[in-house]
Amino acid sequence: MTIKLELLEAALRNALGDQLQSLTQALGEVTIVVKSHDYASAMRVLRDHADLRFEEMIDLCGVDYSTYGDGLWEGPRFAVVSHLLSIKHNWRVRVRVFAADDEMPVVASMIDIWATANWYEREAFDFFGILFEGHNDLRRILTDYGFIGHPFRKDFPVSGYVEMRYDPEQKRVIYQPVTIDPRENVPRVIREEQYGAK
């Protein structure tokens, strides 16, 4: 571990204290996990604490862990992962928070702390169905307003439920049930002995 990462780890442990559920360092990156009820206060500490000063939220996304590790995952299904940047210290940190309820995943909104969280949270809501408590404009951002479901959930069918097409008789776009016939894909086997030889 480099001295820079050691300093970051010590500063995170000191500033967050009991709010820090876990801290891991892999591939030159630090990832922390906080509990959902500590999420808002921990993120405010990350931004405001003099030893940290994570002024920028670079990214925020949702994660569905339902099939993680070949389905051996035992923890909560949904998580929100944020990437923060401290310009002052030239540090980056990944913050993970798990939603307590798998049926209706809810975590606190970060728009009061970082304005950039607005569209990131809308995207996580649109694709994963994660609700952000305190977000004042939580609506779909990339899928159609009439879209049913959340397409990045692992249980969402790859083909979707409906498809759109232009109907020349009605002179408008219409929805109809998916007309793709299910098929079974046979994996292609490549023998390594003579692969690519001429």
Curated annotation (Swiss-Prot):
What's a GO cellular component annotated to this UniProt protein?
Answer: plasma membrane
EC number, as in UniProt: 7.1.1.-
Cell inner membrane keyword on record: yes
Q: Where in the cell is it found?
A: Cell inner membrane
Membrane topology recorded in Swiss-Prot or TrEMBL: Peripheral membrane protein
Which Gene Ontology terms cover its molecular function?
NADH dehydrogenase (ubiquinone) activity; NADH:ubiquinone reductase (non-electrogenic) activity; quinone binding
Q: Which Pfam families match?
A: Complex1_30kDa
Q: Which domain of life is it from?
A: Bacteria
UniProt xrefs under InterPro entries:
NADH_DH_suC (IPR010218), NADH_quin_OxRdtase_su_C/D-like (IPR037232), NADH_UbQ_OxRdtase_30kDa_su (IPR001268), NADH_UbQ_OxRdtase_CS (IPR020396)
- Subunit field text: NDH-1 is composed of 14 different subunits. Subunits NuoB, C, D, E, F, and G constitute the peripheral sector of the complex.
Family membership: Belongs to the complex I 30 kDa subunit family.
Under what name is this protein listed?
NADH-quinone oxidoreductase subunit C
